[in-house]
Design a protein with these regions (language model features):
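Short amphipathic alpha-helical segments, especially helix-boundary/capping motifs
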Residues: 29-33, 49, 66-72, 97-99, ...
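Structured ligand/cofactor/substrate-binding pocket environments in proteins
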Residues: 44-51, 59, 65-71, 81-88, ...
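A generic secondary-structure signal for well-formed alpha-helical elements
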Residues: 93, 100, 128-132, 171, ...
Length: 358
């Protein structure tokens, strides 16, 4: 990283040399602290499961200390869902638990329940310039896709808020995709600049330099061949029943070629379905395509429906059972907030001390 006005310039660069991939050895897993999470904008779908949820559970089971954030404050950057925010938050926790996250081993909490985390945003904002924020490609992209006539301040400072998310618990690893590296670079820059400006009296740094844990999961497209999205109607929700799953997959786009092959560039719709079946079967997508062969779109969709419903049957059963006790979901959030608040309060106290605040 360059020292001056480049918090977002690294958006055009590859991952840092110290970053890790999901298959890299972690050494002592218990020595690592991971921050990850989601915005509660709606139900999680199969893309979330194969892209992030599976890996979170794997890290948890290895003994990594996990912090899983329900980013409810970040939802209001670009939408007003006040009438559904509590429901979406509970359903997100429901998906987490059904997928295998264990609240005894993972701290699951909501932004709005941890005041000290959000208070870190103020000193952190003093460490980045307006020009740096305006160059952040993720912010630019979200602004371009926003329906708002004017961008609000919360959206504009979104990367710094994410830096506070990461640094409040002093996370040293952050699972991200390549497209999220610019946000992580902001957190790295904030940490470095804060440590340079406000070191401890003995020279110790307050914050670690967080590293990326780059996902090796293939991008699972939606049923229309485009990006899988909760808002585009091209995704199967984790909690969907088997009939709904079948209906959505039967309506997926394919092409006129009867021979089923796996070619994501030339045949994105067909290849997306093949990949979904392969992920559920834990097989190579080329082998799945070869097995279907000349069966055509109907055989492909049957295979996908059977594969998805079989793979997710245990998860969906757990989800249905957990859904009968909404009070437990709220208790998970309260317990997580208690742990997160203790850590955030200690971090804020340390920040105020090195800054010389009374």
């Amino acid at each position: 990283m360059t020292p001056a006005a480049t918090a977002t310039a690294t958006a055009t660069t590859a991952a840092d040399a110290s970053d890790l991939t999901a298959t890299d050895p972690l050494g002592d897993p218990s020595s690592h602290r991971v921050l990850t999470g989601d915005r509660p904008t709606g139900p999680l779908h199969l893309g979330h499961y194969f892209g992030t949820l599976r890996n979170r559970v794997r890290l948890q089971d290895q003994g990594v200390e996990m912090f899983v954030l329900v980013a409810d404050y970040q939802v209001i950057t670009d939408r007003d869902i006040a009438d559904r925010l509590a429901e979406h938050t509970e359903n997100l926790v429901l998906d987490y638990l059904a997928a295998g996250l264990d609240p005894e081993r993972a701290t699951i909490f909501a932004h709005s329940a941890v005041p000290a985390l959000n208070q870190l945003l103020l000193p952190f904002l003093s460490l980045v310039s307006v020009a740096e924020l305006s160059r952040n490609p993720t912010v630019k992209d979200e602004i371009a896709h926003s329906s708002q006539a004017a961008v609000n301040g919360l959206m504009f400072t979104y990367p710094v808020h994410q830096a506070a998310d990461i640094l409040f618990c002093k996370a040293d690893l952050v699972p991200v995709g390549q497209d999220q590296l610019p946000h992580l670079e902001v957190a790295r820059t904030v940490a470095r600049r804060f440590n340079e400006r406000y070191p401890h009296a003995d020279g110790r740094a307050v914050f670690p330099r967080p590293r990326a844990l780059l996902s090796d999961a293939p991008m699972l497209p939606g049923t229309d061949g485009g990006k899988m999205s909760k808002s585009r109607g091209n995704a199967v929700a984790l909690g969907a029943d088997e009939d709904t799953t079948a209906r959505i997959i039967r309506g997926a786009k394919t092409d006129a070629d009867r021979r089923i092959t796996y070619d994501p560039s030339a045949r994105p719709e067909v290849s997306g379905l093949v990949l979904l079946a392969a992920l559920c079967q834990e097989r190579d997508p080329e082998a799945v395509a070869e097995e279907i062969g000349d069966g055509g779109a109907a055989a492909l969709k049957r295979t996908v429906i059977e594969s998805v419903n079989e793979h997710f049957r245990p998860l969906r059963a757990r989800r249905a059972e957990l859904a009968t006790d909404r009070g437990h979901l709220r208790q998970v959030l309260r317990d997580g907030a208690e742990r997160a608040n203790a850590i955030a309060d200690a971090t804020l106290a340390e920040v105020r001390e090195v800054m010389g605040a009374i």
